[in-house]
């Protein structure tokens, strides 16, 4: 019995330690730009294909074109400014489609994607989703929306070995992220579901069609969406 009690005591201490460590890490990352993150580490260890070079340069949100900010919101999470980390309607739709044997994209919010890229591995287990939800909740409570968007745009993968808006802008268009046009921004956002498959330059027919849809959504959302993001706490 003593052995069992010791095991449970050790496990309780471990869980408590991880609990406080997770909170501390999110607090620190509100002010410190992460030098590395789990998705990049996993790609380095288990790349889908050989990577010759890894590109990444951190940029503040003010140094990233508003066109790209809006394009990513239009493509990935149009309710970003208003939700608390989770899009319940999208989750409900995903469950319904999965029950029918279909797949639906878009159940994960930008907050969830940022949490996954920062802290998680690529497994689809319920344990991973639960931990991802915990980090998403922490980020929504401790960060503001602008910080979540900034981190997402700096760590998301835009192509093999290409991380963040600045590296993607320079690689595909030969310019800084601050100078991206609406068309260029929509191309980058169109590739986000699978940047290893969907090519930005030259864009595939799918990317062209999706980028046109994204630009239409951007017109409907308008600049007021970014204003709401910057005002949201």
UniProtKB/Swiss-Prot annotation:
Subcellular location, record wording: Cell inner membrane
Lineage: Bacteria, Pseudomonadati, Pseudomonadota, Gammaproteobacteria, Alteromonadales
InterPro entries, per database record: Glyco_trans_51, Lysozyme-like_dom_sf, PBP_transglycosylase, Pep_trsgly
PANTHER family: BIOSYNTHETIC PEPTIDOGLYCAN TRANSGLYCOSYLASE, MONOFUNCTIONAL BIOSYNTHETIC PEPTIDOGLYCAN TRANSGLYCOSYLASE
Name of this chain's protein: Biosynthetic peptidoglycan transglycosylase
Transmembrane domains' residue ranges: 7-27
Main location: membrane
E.C. number(s) listed in UniProt: 2.4.99.28
Species whose genome carries this gene: Shewanella oneidensis (strain ATCC 700550 / JCM 31522 / CIP 106686 / LMG 19005 / NCIMB 14063 / MR-1)
